UniProtKB/Swiss-Prot annotation:
It comes from the Bacteria. This is UPF0145 protein OEOE_0637. Belongs to the UPF0145 family. PANTHER family: UPF0145 PROTEIN SCO3412 (PTHR34068:SF2), UPF0145 PROTEIN YBJQ (PTHR34068). HAMAP family: UPF0145 (MF_00338). InterPro entries: UPF0145_dom_sf, UPF0145_YbjQ-like. It comes from Oenococcus oeni (strain ATCC BAA-331 / PSU-1). Gene3D superfamilies: Hypothetical protein apc22750. Chain B.
């Protein structure tokens, strides 16, 4: 499955457009790690726990995006983007784009 952030894929032509497709994940933070991360904000620097959580969520959202595109017959996703939201220690990440069927030129 090809996933790109551009409208076109070099070396391929778009044969069919299926439309919007997305992958969503929602994760909660570990209370102990959140407390430790809160202490880290007092001294500055990267909050590794939160970075890892966001990275895992983005990877999971992309995998779900690919699975959803595959289910409708697409073999690529163009114009892929991320959106995220966090409230009360719960983080949602969505990967979305346009599901397409492509073939090599």
């Amino acid at each position: 499955m090809i996933v790109c952030t551009t409208e076109n894929i070099a070396g391929y032509r778009i044969d069919k457009t299926f439309g919007e497709v997305f992958g969503l994940t929602t994760r909660s933070r570990n209370l102990v790690r959140t407390f430790g991360a809160g202490l880290k904000t007092l001294v500055g620097g990267e909050v590794v726990t939160w970075t890892q959580l966001q990275d895992q969520a983005r990877l999971e959202a992309i995998e779900r995006l690919k699975n959803n595109a595959d289910k409708i017959g697409a073999n690529a996703v163009t114009m892929m983007r991320f959106d995220s939201n966090e409230a009360n220690g719960i983080m949602s990440v969505v990967a979305y784009g346009t599901a397409v069927k492509v073939s090599e030129l």
